[in-house]
Design a protein with these regions (language model features):
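Bacterial Sec-dependent N-terminal signal peptides
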Residues: 1-23, 204, 208
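Gram-negative (and chloroplast) outer-membrane scaffold detector with strong preference
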Residues: 25-26, 32-34, 49, 56-134, ...
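Solvent-exposed loop/turn segments connecting transmembrane beta-strands
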Residues: 39-46, 109-111
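Solvent-exposed, glycine/polar-rich loop segments of beta-barrel outer-membrane systems
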Residues: 134-135, 180-188
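Conserved active-site loop/cleft motifs that coordinate metal ions or position small ligands
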Residues: 162-167
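Short, solvent-exposed beta-strand-terminating loops
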Residues: 168-175
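C-terminal beta-signal and terminal closure region of outer-membrane beta-barrel proteins
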Residues: 185-199
Length: 208
């Protein structure tokens, strides 16, 4: 009798674990972060904040499609040399909003661990404001479209909660700049391959 009861409990746990990413399930989650640093001897400062909620639906077992939204704010304050015998400080403030449709595939390793690959196409827009302690401020609007693939793994401490660790694997960004102070525009393209294992991305997801 005890053996049958134990077998039943194990079976239920297995079904619960597999149900996390089965067809018809939903996932809600995202990430939030704050960073601040100060560099000597130039007294350069950097601070940033981001929040990125997301929601997805499993269209098939282990395959989810969804949409993420993001907000990013950063401020850089640095020593830019001297002017007229005095110290020159330059400040740059960046504010960006993003929309990120995504597709994600999970591969189960055990009841509590799953590897995944996340493909997303972020669309972002915002502005970057540069100024210094002398007359003159430069404001530029920025728009970008890109694509990225991020591998990672999810740990499930409970049947509905997942803690994720991932790295940026492959990224591509096409960014355009529109300077308000003049008629000149800027345009950059960036393609990068390689995972920075020292800077993992951490997120929390809720499955139901």
């Amino acid at each position: 009798m005890k053996k049958l009861l134990l077998l039943a409990v194990v079976s239920v746990l297995g079904l619960t674990a597999s149900a996390q990413t089965e067809k018809g399930s939903f996932v809600l989650g995202g990430s939030i972060g704050y960073y601040k640093d100060k560099y000597t001897p130039d007294n350069n400062k950097l601070s940033s904040f981001h929040i990125a909620p997301s929601a997805g639906y499993f269209v098939a077992d282990n395959i989810a499609v969804g949409l993420g939204l993001g907000y990013w704010q950063a401020k850089y304050d640095q020593n830019a040399g001297t002017i007229n015998g005095g110290a020159l400080r330059a400040t740059m403030k960046e504010e960006l909003f993003s929309i990120r449709p995504f597709v994600r595939y999970y591969k189960s390793v055990s009841d509590q661990f799953k590897f995944f690959g996340n493909l997303q196409v972020p669309l972002s827009f915002g502005n970057i404001k540069s100024s210094a302690n002398y007359p003159g401020t430069n404001i530029r609007k920025t728009n970008a479209v890109g694509a990225s693939f991020s591998p990672g793994f999810a740990y499930f401490p409970t049947s509905k909660l997942g803690i994720e660790f991932s790295v940026e694997g492959i990224t591509y960004n096409d960014t355009s700049y529109d300077y308000e102070s003049n008629t000149s525009n800027g345009h950059t393209k960036q393609f990068r391959i390689g995972a920075n294992l020292m800077s993992p991305l951490i997120g929390v997801q809720y499955y139901f």
